[in-house]
Amino acid sequence: MRTFTLIWFGQLVSTIGSYITDFALTLWAWEMTGSATALALVGFFSQLARMPITLVAGLIVDRFNRQRLMMLGDGVAALATVGIALLYLADSLHIWHLYAAATLNGGFGQVQSLAYQTSISTLVPPSQLTRANSMNSAVHYGAAIFGPALAGVLYPLVGLLGIAGIDLVTFGAAIATLLLCHIPQPPPRAEADLETRFAKLTFGFREVWRQPSLRSLLLITTVFWFFHDFGGAVYNPMILARSGGSAAALASAAAAAGIGGVTGAIFLSIWGGPKRRFKVMLAGFIGAGLSKTVFGLGRSPAIWMPAQFCSSLNFPLLGSAETALWMQAIAPEKQGRVFAANSLVLQGMSVISALVAGPLADRLLEPAAVTDGWSSTGLGVIFGTESGAGMAFLYVGCALAMMGVGIGGLFRSKPQQI
């Protein structure tokens, strides 16, 4: 457990640094473009790079040294940060450079993440796995609390160049902890022939398709995450537009999300998890959608922070219930391939939502929000007519759709049979 804790600490520090940089780059991109599309495309290129890697990441991690793969992922991310810093220093940084960096980080980050996840079972005894997984949840939510808050304070003081320097130091901490530790490799498996390897790539899809209850579960979760990511694509630009580009407003919302997630995870660990998992997952869908609806209707941090806290409170609950359903329905030796297939489907939906949401907001909804027709229908009263109103309309629409998925799922009998 000591070795895992040291590596975990390095990953926590590195993730906080990444959140600081991502936050600063979001502010820089908004200052340069004022475009929801520009921000959404960063997520698009990151997810686009992950999709083909997801198909083969399991084979890569099983074949090559996982410790070196983790260092490779951190090293590539550090090089991307150096590249951005040099371009900024030369006054040559453009928005498309962020897309290139997102593509690079997305692909290598997928391998790095899987190498880290699959190393846990070789570092931690079975009795400590639950504790280790709880610590991993803290990496994301803890970074979500501290990263944006630090960036909101540091960005006005040290600028993008200073933020990049801090990020490089955190990458160094992650790589140093890996160099100080030894991660045992699992026993090598017999090499499969080429045909078998290609068959493995489609096994997860075939396994889900074979069982009607799993098909229905995947459909429900895919539709939910599609609307979640569709609204999420305009989340940052909506806050920045509504707040006049305030870094403090964006940081406060991000911190509230982290606190809500940590609170939900702590509650879940004390409770021990639900028994009627499918209905609890749907309740999480409804709760998240309701909270996001309130968030989208708000126009200041006074509304955004409590609404975001309540929204994030639901995700550890719905996420754990969904994962438990899959684990309950799929044999352990098949779970990796099935989870990879599910991940690929969700990534595809995320790519589509990121590609469509930004242009829809910029070219249709934001211009429509300043027309007389917008006010005459009552939308002006609900969402306002200032900058960000069109994005708020889109965000609330997606939140209501998330609620609809949760309510509609109550009438689906097949997933309840799992």
Give the role of each language-model region.
Residues V42, P52-V56, R63, L69, ...:
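C-terminal transmembrane bundle of multi-pass solute transporters/carriers
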Residues A90, H140-T177:
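Helix-loop-helix hairpin linking two adjacent transmembrane segments in secondary transporters
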Residues D91, T118, T122, A164-E195, ...:
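Helix-loop junctions on the cytosolic side of multi-pass membrane transporters
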Residues S14-T15, S46, N136-H140, A257, ...:
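Structural signature of transmembrane alpha-helices in multi-pass secondary transporters
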Residues A101-A144, P148:
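Cytoplasmic helix-loop-helix junction between adjacent transmembrane helices
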Residues L6-I7, L93-A101, S216-L217, A302-Q308:
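Short hydrophobic/alpha-helical segments at membrane-entry points of transmembrane helices
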Residues T21-A24, W28, T33-G43, S134, ...:
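Small-residue hotspots at the loop-to-helix junctions and early N-terminal turns
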